[in-house]
């Protein structure tokens, strides 16, 4: 149907494995032309699924060079939409502008609560009774794009941060896969920084 690529920035590979497994089984009817990451150790995962892998290191001094490499890859492979499988970086504005409501992110909290890089730690400090995951379209405002899918799981005082992270990772996989499927099936209508998702 369309072309998607998976951006992977940190060594959190649970969402990547899940997407590739669903792709391989035919659940996600989409082509994945390549995977790009700043970690070479994810290359064997891409190889095992027969998907081209590109290692693009990210640093403050080489941020512009990395951005240009990403744009070249996106254009070369005629990418239709982008999936950020725990990207954990701020997406460049020119890429967001080139793919309006076509960049799908997974955030490891129930937005709008606990934005940023360590929401499980923040949730633990607040003593929350539920944790969640949110998949949304990327906009120039951090973790504030139109929400496609969310889900939650109950937790208690007995859970450690490690427990919260483990429970959250299971949610992240399901929420991201559901959001991708809704996007592929053209079930998402965006308006006023919100979405209507048709069932």
Locate the predicted segments by residue:
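Short loop/helix-cap segments at secondary-structure boundaries that form the rim of catalytic
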Residues: 43-48, 96-98
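Short internal beta-strands
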Residues: 30-41
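Donor/substrate-binding cores of folate-linked one-carbon enzymes
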Residues: 38-39, 62-66, 77-199
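Short, small-residue-biased leader/transition segments that mark boundaries at the very start
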Residues: 2-7
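Adenosine-nucleotide cofactor-binding segment
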Residues: 47, 51-77
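Short, glycine-rich nucleotide/cofactor-binding loops
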Residues: 8-14
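Histidine-anchored nucleotide/phosphate-binding helix
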Residues: 15-24
